[in-house]
A protein has these predicted regions:
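ATP-dependent carboxylate/phosphate-activation module, predominantly the ATP-grasp catalytic core
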Residues: 180, 184-248, 270-296, 304-305
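A conserved helix-loop-beta module that forms one wall/lid of the active-site cleft
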Residues: 100-165
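ATP-binding N-terminal substructure of ATP-dependent carboxylate-amine bond-forming enzymes
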Residues: 1-115, 122, 317, 345, ...
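Short acidic-glycine loop/turn motifs at beta-strand connectors
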Residues: 190-195, 259-263, 317-319, 357-358
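Hydrophobic anchor at the start of a short beta-strand
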Residues: 32-33, 127-128, 144, 173, ...
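Peripheral (often C-terminal) accessory segments that flank ATP-dependent C-N-forming ligase machineries
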Residues: 12, 291-391
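ATP-grasp fold ATP-binding core
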Residues: 120, 130, 140-157, 171-187, ...
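A short glycine-rich, hydrophobically flanked beta-strand micro-motif that places a catalytic Asp/Glu
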Residues: 249-261, 304, 386-391
Length: 391
């Protein structure tokens, strides 16, 4: 007999950074145990118990090693009803409690950008032309985009401009044609057979006023707002649903697009919770973790109507930075709040900034204003000792 998915559950969320998932689960009324590589202040507040993983995600296998050790300890204490494997370990095999993820083989396969490109082509979906390094000659002209075959966030994505540069590229990488357009995504909830697109989102990529460089992911604005593009956005949401259904995914999933002049082109499929979660929940009022949980019982939500615009911007350090105070003293509209005493090197994410507004411009202006207040406070912190700064 299945347990009711709407009763409070004891949920373990573990991964490289899990604040967004854990906070959503907590807002849904569940009892959350969380472990990641940061243990940010708001993660500690959202969870009944939190743990800082002893892992360096840059070392292959280290995050999985630490996560397995923690899961084993938690399972032995019989503390959880289910677990969510978050960023960095979504395709890991775990035992001892129900795993609320796509099957590891499915996650691994779909996260392979080269495999996905071939599948999209075979299935007839318009997508960004993608090839292996060896087949890059099939693509049209320069510049081209080179990115890791697996992975997210855009940190290692780069452009190449000549055949000589291309000849010097090696490793487990893919090459894509550069396509002009708006970076976008569709958030989908699925039960393995059917899917519901719950929002279309604008992606902030390489946003300079957030300190983002290159093609780095810097956040989202929900809903995607493009005048005279309503029909195209509706088409994009339908495509997102169809892809998710054909791949037989379950739970919360995301499909990345480039909204080009020719129409929406599929870029990637993310078979996991996405960074757009905060913006989607602010805009729609729905709880994505609860929708994710219910989908494993075959219950799907109706598509919510946006109440307004929700935004999340990831602020990156413009220089080496010491965090000497709780940044919530500057504005409560922050998430992924670092601990006082922690350090951020140039280019590291510092904090997420949130906003909402009836108009997109309002939400963006609020992000910019809060970003300015945080930066001014951080500049004061850099020139003062911890005792000199009053919170």
């Amino acid at each position: 007999m299945k347990e009711r998915a709407d009763r409070p559950r004891r949920i373990l969320v573990v991964g490289q950074n899990v604040r967004h998932i854990a906070a959503s689960a907590s807002r849904a009324g569940h009892h959350v145990f969380a472990a990641d590589c940061y243990n940010d202040l708001d993660l500690v507040e959202a969870a009944i118990g939190s743990h800082l993983l002893d892992a360096d995600p840059s070392i292959p296998g280290d995050l999985e090693r630490s996560a397995r050790h923690l899961i084993r300890e938690v399972v032995e204490m019989d503390q959880i009803d289910g677990m969510v494997l978050g960023p960095g370990i979504e395709d890991m095999r775990a035992q001892g409690a129900r795993v609320l993820n796509n099957p590891p083989e499915k996650t691994s396969t779909v996260s392979d950008k080269l495999w996905l490109a071939g599948w999209l082509e075979e299935e007839g979906f318009a997508s960004v032309p993608t090839r292996s390094i060896a087949e890059a000659g099939d693509l049209q002209g320069f510049p081209l985009m080179v990115k890791p075959r697996r992975g997210a966030g855009g940190f290692d994505n780069r452009q190449i401009f000549t055949g000589e540069e291309l000849a010097g590229v090696g490793g487990d990488l893919i090459v894509q044609e550069m396509v002009e357009g708006t970076p976008a995504s569709v958030s989908v909830v699925a039960d393995g057979e059917e899917a519901v697109a719950v929002s279309a989102n604008e992606q902030l990529i390489g946003t300079d006023w957030l300190g983002g460089t290159g093609f780095r992911y810097c956040g989202n604005i929900t809903p995607l707002d493009r005048p005279r593009y309503d029909a195209v956005i509706a088409e994009m949401m339908e495509i997102g649903e169809e892809i998710t259904e054909r791949l037989r995914l379950v739970g919360s999933n995301g499909i990345d697009f480039i909204l080009a002049e020719s129409g929406p082109l599929v870029l990637e499929v993310n078979p996991r919770f996405q960074g757009s979660l905060d913006a989607v929940e602010i805009s729609t009022g729905m709880n994505l973790f609860q929708a994710h949980l219910l989908s494993f019982e075959g219950q799907l939500p109706e598509r919510p109507k946006p109440r307004g615009f929700g935004a999340r911007g990831i602020l990156f350090a413009d220089g080496d930075l010491g965090i000497c105070a709780d940044l919530r003293s500057v504005t409560p509209w922050v998430a992924d709040v670092p601990r006082p005493g922690s350090m951020a090197k140039r280019g590291d994410p510092v904090v997420s900034i949130l906003s909402c507004g009836k108009e997109k411009s309002t939400a963006v202006d609020l992000l910019r204003g809060r970003r300015g207040r945080i930066l001014r406070a951080c500049r004061r912190l850099r020139t003062a000792s911890p005792g000199d700064y009053a919170v």
